[in-house]
Amino acid sequence: MLNPIVRKFQYGQHTITLETGIMARQATAAVMASMDDTAVFVTVVGEKTTNSSQKFFPLTVNYQERTYAVGRIPGGFFRREGRPSENEILTARLIDRPIRPLFPKGFCNEIQIIATVVSVNPQINPDIISIIGASAALSLSGIPFYGPIGAARVGFVNNQYVLNPTIDDMKSSFLDLVVSGTQNAVLMVEAESKVLSEDKILGAIMFGHQQQQVVINNIRSLSNEASKLPWIISYPEINTELELKITKLAEKDISNAYLIFNKQERYEKLNFLKEEIIKLFFSENSNIDISEIEDIFEKIEKNIVRKRILNNENRIDGREKDMIRALDIRTGVLPRTHGSSLFTRGETQSLVSVTLGTSRDAQNLDELLGDKTDNFLFHYNFPPYSVGEIGIVGSPKRREIGHGRLAKRSLLAVMPKLDDFPYTIRIVSEITESNGSSSMASVCGASLALMDAGVPIKSAVAGISMGLVKEGDKYVLLSDILGDEDHLGDMDFKVSGTEEGITALQMDIKIEGITNEIMRIALNKAKSARLHILNVMKQALSKPRNEISEFAPRIHKIKINPEKIKDVIGKGGSVIRMLTEETGTIIEIEDDGTIKISATIGEKAKNAIRRIEEITAEIEVGRIYSGKVTRIVDFGAFISIGIGKEGLVHISQISNKRVEKVSDHLTVDQIISVKVLEIDRQGRLRLSIKEVENSIISNKSINNIYI
């Protein structure tokens, strides 16, 4: 007999339901989590056997959307879901980031979380309820987990914070912020805004964290009622004797190695020291656990770096805590691209290119919440050579997709409207060197490359990564962190924006105890750093170039009567196909009669515009036109005076004299002047040649619109 255990509660304007005990009973834990009609089935499976050789925590989070959730059958040949979409990968990261820090240190058992979207209300994004479902499932599983956590989306509409706004609400929101944390601490923030102040952003974080307490309390209540027995985990004992020996032998040398400013030289020295220590202890005891030595060595490194920072000594590369690394900025570095830049900050470097295309180049996205077209693409590539390593080069990894999305969100607030700049824009950031903050270097480089391409962005955007080292009540905030400072520190806080305010923010915190005041100071320090970088960027390129690249397509817009669209397209697309081939342009037609003509050579575009105007010109009764004879019949001749515009010259209208045989006077393809006598209700034209002869014709009175 199935005995469901259900917890239902109100969360803002939505009803949350958490149900367990019916489905997937062989999983370690399973929860059906729903927010109104949007439901996500979340399972957790943990491996109870510990792999002693495992050096990292093997947590896998999979988020998968099923099209049956919205009553659709998948497209494609196989008619089933395939590889995860970009949105699925990003949502999986959103679930992973706040829960990963909450597992005990040294816990290396394999854990897999699968969140399957099984029902979707088109007004409710499944991401928030997915995080809540994962938190609930982990809390029920018995797996060591310092949760539960809550999650909230915060919008900013009419100068008010809105909890978990609907999709329609988000259309008028100046903020899209997701915050997740425990009862006492914020652990993760992901935000995009339309240039809001630091105070507004901090207020949204606090609002979201406060509101999600109801979620945390209800998960606790569900856990008290239905959780499994906690796992009994034995963690490897610390070999204090070995730690003391290695510390005594290597601490001073490791400390000296961290006085080497160059990353590669420092790593070479540290690797040499580590190998020497391993050789020494291995010669004394061939059964010694090498991974244990490596762990102790890393622990000593961490203690040295953190102690120096907390004592206000210089950082790894010799900087003070608020100092930004040296900047080198260049634009127009790739001659045949539409826009480019090379942004270097210390040992982090991004080569950014911008490509302008037409609406045909836009990406069509088939998503559960509705199909949409994306005219702004941002791709971030992190090749192994950027950190001096050898690796597999292939499709983008989760991290690359996540960094690309963050950089894209940083720029959205300043991008021109499609009506004002009708181009599809693709930005590619190639990370050629990396030592921390490569995503923020991509933002800076992309802003410069857009201006180099002549894209009329509203203002320049820069990004900065802040770090934190905290022990007890003592803490130090770091500006423009290195890769090691990110790895050994307690927080990675990325902020991007303009001179006026923040456009995007991403925060991941590894510890509890980050107060509102610490976040406020971090935001203000990030602002100072951002303004400094923007000032240097302004010296390199202060505003968008006046014209787009000579190699970029020029897009010209004209408007025609929507009823004339069929004439431009022609039967089976024959006319538009002929126009594109003969003029060498790309022609796109919208339902409202807007036509976009794109070509890299201006004369080609002008030719296409002239041809379209000829096709769509209104035929007027009494006007004289130059046309071409297309057919001859016994009772007259058909004359084309434009594509799709053919009229009849009756035999009686060919000449003032009697005509016995039409072919005696006219031949096919002959160019002839005709006068429009009548347009009947069906749009058919009655033409005359003899009326032209009876008229006084000037060159200007003839409309040469034959094709």
Swiss-Prot record:
Main location class: cytoplasm
UniProt catalytic activity: RNA(n+1) + phosphate = RNA(n) + a ribonucleoside 5'-diphosphate
First and last residue of the signal peptide: none
Gene Ontology terms: cellular component: cytosol
SMART domains attached to this UniProt entry: KH (SM00322), S1 (SM00316)
InterPro entries (UniProt xref): ExoRNase_PH_dom1 (IPR001247), ExoRNase_PH_dom2 (IPR015847), ExoRNase_PH_dom2_sf (IPR036345), KH_dom (IPR004087), KH_dom_type_1 (IPR004088), KH_dom_type_1_sf (IPR036612), NA-bd_OB-fold (IPR012340), PNPase (IPR012162)
Cofactor(s) this protein cannot do without: Mg(2+)
Gene Ontology terms describing biological process: mRNA catabolic process; RNA processing
EC annotation from Swiss-Prot or TrEMBL: 2.7.7.8
Positions annotated to bind Mg(2+): D486, D492
Keywords: Cytoplasm, Magnesium, Metal-binding, Nucleotidyltransferase, RNA-binding, Transferase
Disulfide cross-links: none
Residue ranges of every copy of the S1 motif domain listed in the record: 622-690
Known role: Involved in mRNA degradation. Catalyzes the phosphorolysis of single-stranded polyribonucleotides processively in the 3'- to 5'-direction.
Entry-linked NCBIfam families: polynuc_phos, PRK11824.1
Name of protein: Polyribonucleotide nucleotidyltransferase
Native species: Buchnera aphidicola subsp. Schizaphis graminum (strain Sg)
Name of encoding gene: pnp
